[in-house]
Amino acid sequence: MSKIILDLQVACDHRCNLPSEDLFMYWLYMVLPLFRKKAEVTIRLVDEAESYNLNKIYRGQNHSTNVLSFPFKAPSPVKLVLLGDIIICRQVVEREAQEQNKILEAYWAHMVIHGSLHLLGYDHFIEQNAKKMEYLETKIMHKLGYLNPYETEIS
């Protein structure tokens, strides 16, 4: 049986429309046990200012972003369950969901799945890797009962 530890940090001013901690755990349990038996993840929900600062420092981008992932790599031969941190910007998620006609809960789920896959080593910088990552995201989203996150939803 898999064991996941979630450290949920809410660092944004407005807490309305945020998914519950149980939902975040549910989404993590749909991804992480496919790859690991044990994992510890921090999910930090932030406002645009913090997202902007982290995106500028770590990616050299001058804008806030929906999700950032910071995998933890333990030095060899240390084996830890700490997988890393997922930073999600509440305002960007809400805005993008509305602009893309996405169901807000489904978009939150997609950000958690996307961020989790980054922690597990997946990326989308090379087309072949992007296709594999998108396939996994879509498969997991379908298991959750959500539509393909890369297609526009009709409201």
Curated annotation (Swiss-Prot):
Pfam families the record matches: YbeY (PF02130)
Annotated GO MF terms: metalloendopeptidase activity; RNA endonuclease activity; zinc ion binding
Origin: domain of life: Bacteria
Residue positions binding Zn(2+): H114, H118, H124
Cofactor: Zn(2+)
EC number: 3.1.-.-
Compartment(s) of residence: Cytoplasm
EC top class named in words: hydrolase
GO cellular component terms, A-Z: cytoplasm
Keywords recorded for this protein, A-Z: Cytoplasm, Endonuclease, Hydrolase, Metal-binding, Nuclease, Ribosome biogenesis, rRNA processing, Zinc
UniProt remark on cofactor binding: Binds 1 zinc ion.
InterPro entries xref list: MetalPrtase_cat_dom_sf_prd, YbeY, YbeY_CS
GO terms for biological process, alphabetical: rRNA processing
Function: Single strand-specific metallo-endoribonuclease involved in late-stage 70S ribosome quality control and in maturation of the 3' terminus of the 16S rRNA.
Family: Belongs to the endoribonuclease YbeY family.
Protein name (Swiss-Prot/TrEMBL): Endoribonuclease YbeY
Organism: Baumannia cicadellinicola subsp. Homalodisca coagulata
Name of the encoding gene: ybeY
